[in-house]
Amino acid sequence: MKALIILGLVLLSVTVQGKIFERCELARTLKKLGLDGYKGVSLANWVCLAKWESGYNTEATNYNPGDESTDYGIFQINSRYWCNNGKTPGAVDACHISCSALLQNNIADAVACAKRVVSDPQGIRAWVAWRNHCQNRDVSQYVKGCGV
């Protein structure tokens, strides 16, 4: 009985960690989910974006004190405009999704919301990390050797 209690406590103390994708694994997943060429954005640009926004980490979050919003998940999708975290003042929730859904290891919801973001007039330029690290650069290295 004592061993079962200890085992239960050990299992409760295990923290759930987000998935950190390997570069080519992410490229294959994004391609499978329809991002390659979506709204004219190459797969290499999406992988570059994810690298610089989250380090390929599905559980990445970043609080923005200026507007009290938070960026979520592999694409760092913002709670001010795109998802609902129940805390951001004046949030729009244009993706009609809970921000916590953007932190899942299965990135289908994050991809669906990213498709919504890139469909706006600003397109992929909505992401600062893409503008700073991927725009007007050779991003082919992000899919090199991935067979995609």
From Swiss-Prot:
Q: Which InterPro entries match?
A: Glyco_hydro_22, Glyco_hydro_22_CS, Glyco_hydro_22_lys, Lysozyme-like_dom_sf
Disulfide-bonded cysteine pairs: these are C24-C146, C48-C134, C83-C99, C95-C113
Give the catalysed reaction(s), semicolon-separated. Answer: Hydrolysis of (1->4)-beta-linkages between N-acetylmuramic acid and N-acetyl-D-glucosamine residues in a peptidoglycan and between N-acetyl-D-glucosamine residues in chitodextrins
Record-linked Pfam families: Lys (PF00062)
- C-type lysozyme domain span: 19-148
**CDD domains (UniProt xref):** LYZ_C
- Give the UniProt entry's GO cellular component terms: extracellular region
- Tell me the first and last residues of the signal peptide: 1-18
Q: Where is the active site?
A: E53, D71
According to its UniProt record, where is this protein mainly located? secreted
Entry keyword annotation includes Disulfide bond: yes
EC numbers: 3.2.1.17
Write out the GO MF terms: lysozyme activity
Q: Which family does it belong to?
A: Belongs to the glycosyl hydrolase 22 family.
Looking up PANTHER family in the UniProt record yields:
LYSOZYME C (PTHR11407:SF28)
What's the further remark here? Lysozyme C is capable of both hydrolysis and transglycosylation; it also shows a slight esterase activity. It acts rapidly on both peptide-substituted and unsubstituted peptidoglycan, and slowly on chitin oligosaccharides.
Per the entry, what this protein does is: Lysozymes have primarily a bacteriolytic function; those in tissues and body fluids are associated with the monocyte-macrophage system and enhance the activity of immunoagents.
The protein's name: Lysozyme C
Give the organism, scientific name.
Answer: Nasalis larvatus
